[in-house]
């Protein structure tokens, strides 16, 4: 039994929603998202809410997934999604080059140029140590943030590197010296 799948999705004013042939198109003030829906799930609109209804018990596994995908699309076109990254380390920083390129200086012998995909924007604070990745597609925002983090993952000994804001890191003890 899917509890998430049974929750109705509120459809805010100004959001257009169409469902045809296994695809859902959600259009709102921030843009337009097309989302592929798994087979066996019907979407119905009642009283300003979208309901995900499974046709048989075999489709219980994708019931909650379908509801979450549609909810993420509706939230994306109304509020948008964002992920914050902290850059920790002496000399580590990021800067914007044009509108679609972030250049990272992360202690390597060369700066790393990171191209931003379409639909994704990055904002860098004045100290150049915090990057905010935002867009309307939740999956794409999370993937870009994960790719940026993988350029220099946090070091377990000094905790230097690129990390998510609020990420808890375990610091390892160094090797015990001889006494």
UniProtKB/Swiss-Prot annotation:
GO terms for cellular component: cytosolic large ribosomal subunit. InterPro entries: Ribosomal_uL6-like, Ribosomal_uL6-like_a/b-dom_sf, Ribosomal_uL6_a/b-dom, Ribosomal_uL6_bac-type. Signal peptide: none annotated. Keywords: Ribonucleoprotein, Ribosomal protein, RNA-binding, rRNA-binding. GO terms for molecular function: rRNA binding; structural constituent of ribosome. One of its GO terms (biological process) is cytoplasmic translation. It holds the Pfam family Ribosomal_L6. Belongs to the universal ribosomal protein uL6 family. This protein binds to the 23S rRNA, and is important in its secondary structure. It is located near the subunit interface in the base of the L7/L12 stalk, and near the tRNA binding site of the peptidyltransferase center. Part of the 50S ribosomal subunit. This is Large ribosomal subunit protein uL6. The lineage of its organism: Bacteria, Pseudomonadati, Acidobacteriota, Terriglobia, Terriglobales.
